[in-house]
Amino acid sequence: EFRRVLFRSSVNEIVGSGKDNQFRRLSLTGTFLDDDEIYLVGRTYEGNAGFHVVTPLRQADDSIIFINRGWVSEDYRLPAQRPFSLTQGVIQIDGIVRLPQQQGYFVPDNEPERGFWFTLKPDEIARFRDYSSVETAYYVDQVRTSEVITLPIAAEVRVDVRNAHLNYALTWFGVALSLIGVYIAYHVSAGRLGFRAKK
């Protein structure tokens, strides 16, 4: 379940809280380093093959956090192929905090020099880009803030707010009524429960 708490703080501050922040929602401001994008191969969107675009975001304190901006097809993989997705200056994004991905048993190793990234591991990207002040304990999945879908296609977060107490109450109320019905039917059939007609 996603925690619908919106933070106006840096990921570094959240990480420093010492809490379990996986899937925590936050807001970030900074500058995208579009020239240092990497592309996660083998990603799909509605059955279409493509990539996930991971862009470093430089924050006001010069620290860097990696942002998984979402899906693009091969035709729009490189920044030059989608100038409409490039930003100028400081921007603000919404996202959710994610732990570094674990490499699957049959997933190949990342090959940075060849541009083949299969698993999102912030520490490997940081070494490849020679970043010094970078967050490697987490990365952020950017989420959509509009119904209009644009490239890269960011994650869609749906939160179903349920009244668990009401559900439980209705469930047990139904069970109780059923048991009462069974009780009455049993005793009537056994002749233990009858109704006398008024004279």
PLM ranges: what are they?
Residues 3-17, 21-199:
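Surface-exposed, charge/polar-rich loops and edge strands
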